[in-house]
């Protein structure tokens, strides 16, 4: 399967391009995943979907590459879907080895010096160059050549804007063709190999319920849970918000819940041990009038599923529980199943500025309603 590295110096608009590409590919129903690798990010479009002030507080920074680089190298190499990989603007020689797991490259550079540097970097790791693009903040969008590689200019790549123009559209079409050529029958194969008899494709589920697959709304949750059998082994496949996965995981309890992880394939939501939290998964407790809030933090940014049995979480007795943090879907799913005893559960969803109730046993707090996060 292709893994396309996006390369260029800092402040060249690479993150804007990455987000624009994944949105355009999603609009064309092209299966893929965007992975940011500096340090890695669990949700590729996280920083563009949330409010800027929220982003400032949630951006992952401090992990050393020694902690996450081997895991990321392993997972890119074992990918289960085509990838877009944003490798950052200043990779170290050690971090540059991620390119060995990639197959193609896209250059976005503002000047000849950075272009030469990144072109040599891609050549060292044997990447086939798909596009050689110039970033010009105040210039004009243009397609200079449609051969191999594509050549052109992308203008105005500022946060809050989307890439556009003939060079961008040509790149989207080229990526779509590359990814689709690698994908025939892959979706069906993934669903057929699900470990649960009932495997649900998130995109198909959205359309069945009249939802936009690229813009799920929390108010759809009651219909989702009405549609799916309760207390039954379930497997969920595809791109969806954390609250959707958390709600279905809680709905399946006590039966098994599985989800498809682009890095690992099908994984089961693990059981987490009770106990005093460790450095691997930090937990801060806030107590409010209506709920307790657990603020989770991953100091190393990239968490291996194999470590789940060593991630103790604190017992909580409260009528309502809000789970906050930036976590992989498998961990959200595990947490809501572990805290089933609470009268209602909500998971943070910064894109809506609050937390979405994913399980409730009381009428006053129905599933799908958004509640405010507790503030320190």
Where are these regions (language model features)?
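Glycine-rich phosphate-binding P-loop
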Residues: 4-23
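Conserved catalytic-core segment of NTP-binding enzymes
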Residues: 89-167
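Long, low-complexity, Lys/Arg-enriched
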Residues: 168-322, 326, 330-376
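Structural motif
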Residues: 7-10, 37-39, 87-89, 108-111, ...
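Pre-Walker A (Motif I) flank of P-loop NTPase domains
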Residues: 1-4, 232
């Amino acid at each position: 399967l292709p893994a396309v590295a996006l390369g260029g110096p800092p402040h060249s608009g690479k993150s804007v391009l990455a987000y624009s590409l994944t949105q355009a590919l999603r609009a064309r129903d092209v299966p893929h995943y965007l992975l940011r690798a500096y340090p890695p990010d669990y949700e590729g479009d996280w920083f563009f979907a949330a409010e800027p002030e929220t982003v400032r507080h949630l951006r992952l920074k401090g992990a050393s590459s020694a902690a996450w680089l081997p895991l990321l190298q392993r997972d890119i190499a074992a990918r289960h879907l085509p990838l877009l990989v944003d490798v950052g603007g200043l990779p170290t020689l050690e971090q540059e080895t991620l390119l060995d797991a990639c197959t193609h490259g896209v250059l976005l550079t503002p000047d000849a010096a950075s272009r030469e540097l990144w072109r040599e970097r891609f050549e060292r790791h044997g990447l086939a160059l798909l596009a050689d693009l110039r970033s010009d903040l105040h210039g004009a969008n243009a397609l200079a050549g449609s051969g191999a590689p594509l050549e052109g200019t992308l203008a105005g790549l500022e946060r809050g804007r989307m890439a556009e123009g003939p060079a961008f559209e040509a790149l989207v079409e080229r990526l779509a063709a590359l990814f689709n050529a690698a994908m025939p029958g892959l979706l069906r194969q993934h669903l057929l190999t699900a470990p649960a008899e009932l495997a649900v494709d998130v995109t198909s589920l959205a359309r069945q319920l009249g939802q936009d697959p690229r813009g799920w709304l929390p108010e759809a949750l009651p219909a989702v849970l009405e549609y799916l059998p309760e207390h039954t082994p379930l497997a969920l496949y595809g791109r969806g918000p954390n609250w959707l996965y958390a709600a279905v995981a809680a709905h399946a309890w006590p039966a098994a819940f599985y989800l498809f992880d682009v890095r690992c394939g099908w994984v089961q939501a693990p059981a987490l041990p009770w106990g005093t939290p460790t450095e691997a998964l930090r937990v801060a407790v806030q107590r409010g009038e209506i709920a307790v809030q657990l603020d989770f933090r991953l100091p190393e940014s990239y968490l291996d599923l194999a470590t789940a049995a060593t991630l103790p979480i604190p017992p909580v007795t409260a009528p309502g529980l809000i789970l906050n943090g930036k976590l992989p879907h498998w961990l959200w799913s595990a947490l809501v199943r572990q805290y089933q005893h609470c009268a209602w559960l909500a998971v943070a969803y910064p894109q809506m500025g609050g937390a979405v109730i994913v399980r409730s046993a009381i009428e006053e707090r129905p599933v799908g309603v958004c509640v405010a996060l507790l503030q320190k």
